[in-house]
A protein has these predicted regions:
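Primarily recognizes the serine-hydrolase "nucleophile elbow" in alpha/beta-hydrolase
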Residues: 95-170, 180, 184-185, 189
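Short alpha-helix in the alpha/beta-hydrolase fold that links the catalytic acid
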Residues: 55, 189, 212-225
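N-terminal cap/lid segment of alpha/beta-hydrolase-fold proteins
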Residues: 1-34, 164-168
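Catalytic nucleophile-loop/oxyanion-hole region of alpha/beta-hydrolase
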Residues: 52-53, 58, 73-111, 306
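Acidic catalytic loop of the alpha/beta-hydrolase fold
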Residues: 162, 207-211, 241
Length: 325
C-alpha cells in the first residue's frame, strides 16, 4: 500500500480567515499494482466543528481492503464558531473530487467510479456537494473542465434537513446564527434533489439520538420522487457516530490523527497571539482539554454493533451493482 498526502488548494487559493496555516488536504491509500480500480473518498463528520478521526482512516482502509483506491478529505471546519463556513467545505469537497478524477491515470482509478462517503455532518457535506456540484465555480484551469459530480454517494447517518429534524449545531457552524430563508432551503438537501443527483446509499439507526433517523428517510424519499437510484438501510438500534461499529473502533483504534490538524493549528495560533479573534482563557482551556478526547487510542464508550457493522459490505455490493464491476 502506498500512502500519500497533499493539499487540495494551491498557494493563494485558500483564503479561509481562520485556517492559521492549515490548508485542506487529501490522504490517499493506494494499491500499487497499476490495476484500475473504483474509488471511495471519505468525508468524516463532526458537526462542521471538527473532522473526526473515528470516521476517517479506518473507513478508508476498510474500503481499501475491499479493492478500492481510497482517500480521506480533511476539510475546513468551524472550531471557534465565530465565522460561519457557508460554502467553503462544499468547495473543498468539489475540488477534491476534481483532483481525484483529473489524476485518475496517475492513481489507477476508474474516472467514472468515484464515490464520496460522508458521516453525520460529513454526510451533509457529501450530499450538499452531490446536489449542488454544478453551482461550485472552479477557477483553476487545471480543474475547471473536470466534473465535480460524484458517481455515487454513501451517506452514513447524515444530517440532511434544516427543518424540524435538523442537527442545530451543524447548521449553526455552517450558516451562522441568523441564516436567511434561502440559505436554509439551499442547505435543506431533501428539497434540492433532482434527477441528476448521484445514486445514493444511505444508512442510519432507528435510535440515533443526535441526528434523527427522519433525515435519511427525507433524502431517500426525495431520491424516489426524482428517479434517483438509491438504497436505504435502517438498523434497529445503535447510537449516533457508529462509524464501522467494529470491535477495534469500540476500543478506540482509529488510526492516524491527521484530521485533527485544524485543531492543532488553531490552538497554536491562539497561544501565539496570532488568531484574528479574541479567545478567552476559558475557551482555550476548553479546547486544550477537548483535543485529547479526539485522539486515536482513547477508548470509545460505545459498544461494537454486529448488526450495523455489515454496512460496508452492503455498500460494496451496492456499488458493484451500480457500476457493473
Amino acid at each position: 500500500m502506498k500512502t500519500i498526502r497533499f493539499s487540495i488548494w494551491e498557494d493563494g487559493e485558500y483564503t479561509w480567515p481562520q485556517g492559521y496555516g492549515f490548508v485542506p488536504f487529501l490522504t490517499g491509500y493506494l494499491h500499487e499494482d497499476n490495476k484500475e480500480r473504483p474509488c471511495v473518498l471519505v468525508v468524516p463528520g463532526g458537526a462542521y466543528y471538527i473532522a473526526s478521526p473515528t470516521e476517517a482512516g479506518i473507513v478508508a482502509l476498510d474500503f481499501y481492503h475491499k479493492g478500492y483506491q481510497t482517500f480521506v478529505l480533511t476539510y475546513t471546519t468551524n472550531l471557534l464558531g465565530t465565522i460561519p463556513l457557508k460554502d467553503q467545505p462544499m468547495r473543498d469537497l468539489a475540488r477534491a473530487v476534481r483532483i481525484v478524477r483529473s489524476r485518475s491515470n496517475e492513481y489507477s482509478i476508474k474516472p467514472d467510479c468515484i464515490a464520496t462517503c460522508g458521516f453525520s455532518a460529513g454526510g451533509h457535506l457529501t450530499a450538499s456537494e452531490g446536489v449542488h456540484y454544478n453551482d461550485i465555480e472552479e477557477k483553476n484551469p487545471l480543474y475547471s473542465n473536470v466534473s465535480a459530480r460524484p458517481d455515487a454517494m454513501l451517506l452514513c447517518y447524515p444530517v440532511i434537513t434544516s427543518g424540524p429534524y435538523t442537527h442545530e449545531g451543524s447548521m449553526q457552524n455552517l450558516l451562522g446564527t441568523n441564516p436567511t430563508a434561502d440559505e436554509l432551503k439551499y442547505m435543506s438537501l431533501e428539497t434540492q434533489v433532482t434527477s441528476q443527483t448521484p445514486p445514493s446509499f444511505l444508512w442510519q439507526t432507528v435510535t440515533d439520538e443526535v441526528v434523527p433517523v427522519e433525515n435519511s428517510y427525507l433524502f431517500a424519499d426525495a431520491c424516489k420522487k426524482n428517479g434517483v437510484s438509491f438504497a436505504h438501510h435502517v438498523f434497529s438500534q445503535g447510537p449516533h457516530g457508529l462509524s464501522l461499529a467494529t470491535a477495534s473502533w469500540a476500543q478506540g483504534i482509529f488510526g492516524e490523527l491527521y484530521t485533527l490538524d485544524p485543531f492543532k493549528y488553531t490552538i497554536d495560533a491562539i497561544k501565539a497571539g496570532t488568531a484574528n479573534v479574541d479567545v478567552s482563557k476559558e475557551k482555550l482551556t476548553d479546547l486544550e482539554r477537548e483535543f485529547p478526547n479526539h485522539m486515536p487510542g482513547n477508548p470509545c464508550s460505545r459498544e461494537p454493533n454486529a448488526e450495523v457493522s455489515i454496512w460496508p459490505c452492503l455498500a460494496d455490493a451496492w456499488l458493484h451493482t451500480q457500476w457493473s464491476l
